[in-house]
Swiss-Prot record:
Entry keyword annotation includes Lyase: yes
Function recorded in the entry: Catalyzes the conversion of urocanate to 4-imidazolone-5-propionate.
Functional pathway: Amino-acid degradation; L-histidine degradation into L-glutamate; N-formimidoyl-L-glutamate from L-histidine: step 2/3
Organism the protein comes from: Vibrio cholerae serotype O1 (strain ATCC 39315 / El Tor Inaba N16961)
GO terms for MF: urocanate hydratase activity
Family assignment from sequence similarity: Belongs to the urocanase family.
Active site residues according to the UniProt entry: 413
Protein name per Swiss-Prot or TrEMBL: Urocanate hydratase
Binding residue positions for NAD(+): 58-59, 136, 182-184, 202, 207, 245-246, 266-270, 276-277, 325, 495
Gene3D superfamilies: Urocanase like domains (3.40.50.10730), Urocanase superfamily (3.40.1770.10)
Amino acid sequence: MTQSSAQGTRLDTQRTIRAPRGTQLRAKSWLTEAPLRMLMNNLDPDVAEHPHALVVYGGIGRAARNWECFDKIVEVLERLEDDQTLLVQSGKPVGVFPTHKNAPRVLIANSNLVPHWANWEHFNELDKQGLMMYGQMTAGSWIYIGSQGIVQGTYETFVAVAKKHFNGDAKGRWVLTGGLGGMGGAQPLAATMAGFSMIAVECDESRIDYRLRTGYVDKKANTLDEALAMIADTDRPISVGLLGNAADIFPELVKRNITPDVVTDQTSAHDPLNGYLPLGWSMEKAAQMRQQNEAEVVKAAKASMAIQVRAMLDLQTRGAATLDYGNNIRQMALEEGVANAFDFPGFVPAYIRPLFCEGIGPFRWAALSGDPEDIYKTDQKVKELIPDNPHLHNWLDMARERIHFQGLPARICWVGLKDRARLGLAFNEMVKNGELKAPIVIGRDHLDSGSVASPNRETEGMLDGSDAVSDWPLLNALLNTAGGATWVSLHHGGGVGMGFSQHSGMVICCDGSDDAAERIARVLHNDPATGVMRHADAGYEIAKRCAQQQKLDLPMLNAELAKLK
């Protein structure tokens, strides 16, 4: 079945897209084969949430604007020369221009609106007319690797929660959350890796079943009583996907006087039209109402979010460690009259910012060969190059044992400024000498230390009050372009929705060449260095010390850095 409109063909149930494997090229070089394979990988049915609709994750986060645009992007990448650059505007290939061999092969801008018009209402009107596409973060930038992409960040957060609130011991404790989509689906596995049990409330049964199949959740429950019994009846951490609505289950726990140890949420609350099921509605009713009365859906969804947030606040008052996990649900509740919605913190200022100050964030890579052995060899190389980090080694061991690859084999690994370029150069050398069967691509989430401005998430509560300053991700994208990343993206609205974030991404191909080594050395140093720069500029001492140790040239801070011991 296909569905076409002014938007072009957005639904085609006859299509199954998978990235090519092996060393046979469809494009003219690995520098254009890499974005081709990663675009296709984003739409692999083992990777994407709704591949037939081009939706990768995060509500309506798409890889291409419509199927006509997808086909044309593929066609262009197959013919693109190594001195040309393809421009993609909100999922639509709009131009090919002469550049040079060290320039990016693809430059992408997704979902960007002039600030006064940067809201869901205006975006949705443009989207209906086929003029825009929501790229989320890694959906429209072609570097989504399935739920693994956020597992380690979520794991690091839960480990930090255990350290801060429970003396580092999560045994016998449990987390309540909502949402098992592409991002939220990482929560159950991350929680059990960190030693917590978890009840994850999800209204779409197919998503629970998918997480069961891929090993991200342990069990499914149809009632709250059943879920509570499951986590009580075990000596080991266990995760349960509970079929229900978070706006119903969270208040029910308050009513029953049952207080989880930790409370958070990863529903797609950032998009009230497409991402959150109103209380009392069926999935079918919501789908029908989205066609008939969008305003009513948004109104009902935001009212339901307010109910959920009030319950989260009540549970916080009763002693639960409560945190916002970056979906902007507090903002939605605030707009619905929950004046104290921001009384519980976001996860970045509460637990992650010290890592950002050292440029540490979600470094990821994928094996274009399709062979898992290439990833296992790179895992070992990471251990060799970073021998004195048992926490990182433990993560890599757990990842190999417990994480199922989705699509092309890939790995996520939080490392910082002092290590990223070293790892990239080592991977490139492994390709050069034949240790790996084909090139590797290295990218990251847009959720990183220097690549995002998001006052309700990554840049919440900055020391100098610069939460909303979005010059930083723009500079990051420009620098990665100048440095020669293979493709660079600049997006708006990812994670927290329209009007609340701007962010940039980069991917670089390790094809084993000497030219690639030069590009890798530049890009994988500069990219995390912008994060250290951004946090040092905001006044964070950890970032200043890192800048001094890594010999960054920060003109307004150099005199101060020179005095640090």
